[in-house]
């Protein structure tokens, strides 16, 4: 009979230990479940906020920067071609002092525009190489000598956008 009592006490102790251990596991499991639920809710809220704001990815930002720089370059090159044609017309006509000054001014503008194209191409190269802080050396719109820029000039607006894009991203 003493062996039955000893066996009975052993079972009671084991059952109590299992109950305590089981309760501890339940508490820890609940704490982990709550922590996981909170983490999942935070991740879902962040994902929803990102989806609502529609923030571009890093690759999309790079692509937008390159597209903007290429668009600016296409406008700059179109204007260089236009100025070069004007320059050729001035050279074909009789050259006098007033035309000579005009020719020099046009050559300076062409040089300025081509420097901008070169700076933009360097920036595109750096962006494609993965340099995160790459930005063009010239972020201001070109100033046309002896002419006021009209407020609707697309190049001025694109340079303003360019400055903002490279400032934010």
From Swiss-Prot:
It comes from the Eukaryota. Sequence repeats lie at residues 28-31, 32-35, 36-39, 40-43, 44-47, 48-51, 76-80, 160-165. Its main location: nucleus. Residues 28-51 are annotated as: 6 X 4 AA tandem repeats of N-[AT]-[NT]-A. The modification N-acetylserine is found at residue 2. GO terms for biological process: chromatin remodeling; positive regulation of transcription by RNA polymerase II; regulation of transcription by RNA polymerase II. It is found in: Nucleus. Component of the SWI/SNF global transcription activator complex. The 1.14 MDa SWI/SNF complex is composed of 11 different subunits: one copy each of SWI1, SNF2/SWI2, SNF5, SNF12/SWP73, ARP7/SWP61, ARP9/SWP59; two copies each of SWI3, SNF6, SNF11, SWP82; and three copies of TAF14/SWP29. This is Transcription regulatory protein SNF11.
């Amino acid at each position: 009979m003493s062996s039955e009592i000893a066996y009975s006490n052993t079972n009671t102790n084991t059952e109590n230990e299992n109950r305590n251990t089981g309760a501890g596991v339940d508490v820890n499991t609940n704490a982990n479940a709550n922590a996981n639920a909170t983490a999942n809710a935070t991740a879902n809220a962040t994902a929803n906020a990102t989806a609502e704001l529609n923030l571009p990815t890093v690759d999309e930002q790079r692509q937008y920067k390159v597209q903007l720089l290429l668009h600016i370059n296409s406008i700059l090159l179109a204007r260089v071609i236009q100025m070069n044609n004007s320059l050729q017309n001035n050279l074909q006509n009789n050259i006098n002092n007033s035309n000579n000054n005009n020719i020099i001014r046009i050559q300076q503008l062409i040089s300025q525009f081509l420097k901008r194209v070169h700076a933009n191409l360097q920036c595109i190269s750096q962006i494609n190489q993965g340099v995160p802080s790459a930005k063009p050396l010239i972020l201001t719109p070109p100033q046309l000598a002896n002419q006021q820029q009209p407020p609707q000039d697309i190049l001025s607006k694109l340079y303003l956008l360019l400055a903002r894009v490279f400032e934010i991203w």
